[in-house]
Amino acid sequence: MDERLTLRRRIALDITKKLQDDVIKEHPLRQLFWECTLRCNHHCRHCGSDCKQTALVPDMPMADFAKVLDSVRAATDPHKVMINVTGGEPLMRPDLEACGRMMYEKEFPWGMVTNGWGLTPERYKRLLQSGLRAMTISLDGLEEDHDWMRGVPGSFKRASAAIKMVIDSGEIAFDVVTCVNRRNYPHLAEVRDYLIGLGLKEWRLFTVFPVGRAAHDPELQLTGEEIRGLMEFIKATRKEGRIKAEFACEGFLGNYEGDVRDHFYMCQAGVSVASVLADGSISACASIRADYHQGNIYKDDFMEVWNSRFQPYRDRTWMYKDDCASCRHWKYCRGNGMHLRDENGKLIQCLLKKM
């Protein structure tokens, strides 16, 4: 779908681009993801890390990540940096509450992404007492589709119970994420209504990009027509106003920009977003290939790496090749998301082109 941008949209994008240029120049760290474990109790069809219940890479010791936070605190205001705890499945760590207290005592707001399986009322209470500020739970369709995607019977019921519990508590910022695939795509309206029935206010939708297990599973990849249908669905849901639906930061969307997200597209990886992976690697988003890691906390100071490296993320002229070199939207897209680049720098997928 390579249609020309409307004049109004082009003007808005030009203004936004200038603001984005300033953000890139300043690269203020605003989100830090901590891959605290690679262990997981699910067997998701779309998993990019191919996690297992007993991972070969051990959990990162809390003290090691604490040193990273000390590096950040020495250079910036901790209140402005959100720590997002991910995995694997974070709830597999028995010391997660202790990790939360450590982050809280160092004055960082923190949240987590979970499948909800282990989120009992008792565990949730302890996490709140440890300073938990935000949470995201995954729900990939209604019962049959979710359990199929997650590879564990009963996972839908457990996720739903966790979602309802967090909503009813009303104590933290909360959203649900859904990975849209060919199987759950026809049922998105039913999923939306189910989530509204639970009382959910914010819902993020992703497509599944072809890496990890998903690279060899055609049931997970939407067609161009289905991607357009997804955009129209999000657009209509936002207009309806019963729930705030938003498409994820997966790439530039042409004339859907401004309609399916609250902001215009920008890949924040390496600009305001960084990650510390389970093996100590310093990266941007955890889903980006190891070829683009910028250092390792076991030999580098985190903030030194953040301030002196990450050039491939902040200067993307190296992406100006192949289809990107002839794309009329290059100056707004800047080569798409870093998670969509292979080990040779080639773009794996462009949603706009696919539409």
Spans of model-derived segments:
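Flexible loop residues that form catalytic
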Residues: 52, 88, 140, 208, ...
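Conserved alpha-helical substructure of the radical SAM core
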Residues: 2-134, 222
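Cys/His-rich metal-chelating microdomains
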Residues: 39, 43, 47-50, 270, ...
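Radical SAM enzyme [4Fe-4S]-AdoMet core and its adjacent flexible, acidic
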Residues: 13, 55-56, 60, 129-140, ...
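Flexible mid-to-C-terminal extensions adjoining Fe-S/redox cofactors in radical SAM and related proteins
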Residues: 7-28, 287-355
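Residues immediately within or flanking Cys/His clusters that coordinate Zn2+
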Residues: 33, 37, 41, 264, ...
